[in-house]
Amino acid sequence: MAGFMRQLFVCMIGIYGSFLSWAVMQEKIITRPYDGERFSSPALLSLAQSFMTVLCGLLWNWFHGVSARGLLEPKFLGYFSSIAISASLSSYFGYASMFHLSYPTVILGKSCKLLPVIALHVFVYKRKFPPHKYLIVTMITAGVSIFSYFQNTSSKGKHAEHDSPIGLLLLFFNLLMDGITNTTQDKVFGKYKLSSVTMMIAVNLGIACLNGLYLISPFCNQQPLSFINRHPSILKDMLLFACTGSVGQLFIFFTLEKFGSITLVTITLTRKIFTMLLSVFHFHHTVSSIQWLGILLVFLGISLEAGLKILNNNSTAKKKAS
């Protein structure tokens, strides 16, 4: 029992420590100027993150004696390519939204992963969902809307933060691409025997290649290397960002493997809350009383979603046992 609790504690500290540090680095790099100049090359940031994730994934597989040779089989290439493209687009839209939204708004908005999925299925495929899913989406959307609207009306002064409709639209497309990525991954997992870490390696390898090609193409005029030459301190931040994100992914896989999805859902939920609070207090974002109501609505919505998922998993497990 002591060993079990010790492993769980290590997983919790690993996930919290990695992803809270990752979020701080991400917000600093994207939203804070370096000697008066802001970093404007999300592609380089995505390349650093995906390269480090591939490296960590290969080390994980090597440690567990898992071969990655099957990644280049023709039957996987089509799937991996499409996942890499949708994941790269998701990353692009996500980073682009940060130039038009405050970071707390982005964190809250990313909690509403159900919105684009339900919108796509309802309006395109004419599919219906259980009432609780509509309730969850309504609560989270209302919370994000309240927070974003009052971000604009309460922000004043030279360094005021403002959320624009363009930013919210970009965030919607980020979530939509996320949904497409996850759906395709589920299809691959259902069709082939493939570990999550191997999938992570393949997808991030594709993302690294796509971003690398973009950075050396004539379409890229952001000159990220010139920015690094002018502000070399960003290299340390980028390295911390890439390392903490990659290590956090490994802690997630380890937690899922050792303790199951219910424990992981609980840890992920509390991690989102801590990330939001850390952003507000560490970077001194101004949050009004009504905006705290919006935050509360969002976290009530994702708590309801997590609770129902846990209940559903428990009932499924009982049915299998009987």
Curated annotation (Swiss-Prot):
Keywords: Endoplasmic reticulum, Glycoprotein, Membrane, Sugar transport, Transmembrane, Transmembrane helix, Transport
Pfam families found in the cross-reference section: UAA (PF08449)
Glycan-carrying positions: 152, 313-314
Membrane topology: Multi-pass membrane protein
Main location (coarse class): endoplasmic reticulum
GO function term, MF aspect, one: UDP-galactose transmembrane transporter activity
Segments traversing the membrane: 4-24, 43-63, 76-96, 105-125, 129-149, 164-184, 199-219, 250-270, 290-310
Example GO BP: UDP-glucose transmembrane transport into endoplasmic reticulum
GO CC term, one of those recorded: endoplasmic reticulum
Database matches in SUPFAM superfamilies: Multidrug resistance efflux transporter EmrE (SSF103481)
Cysteine pairings via disulfide bonds: none
Subcellular location as annotated: Endoplasmic reticulum membrane
Domain of life (superkingdom): Eukaryota
Role of this protein: May be involved in specific transport of UDP-Gal from the cytosol to the Golgi lumen. Involved in the maintenance of optimal conditions for the folding of secretory pathway proteins in the endoplasmic reticulum.
Protein family per UniProt: Belongs to the nucleotide-sugar transporter family. SLC35B subfamily.
Name of this protein: UDP-galactose transporter homolog 1
Species the sequence originates in: Schizosaccharomyces pombe (strain 972 / ATCC 24843) (Fission yeast)
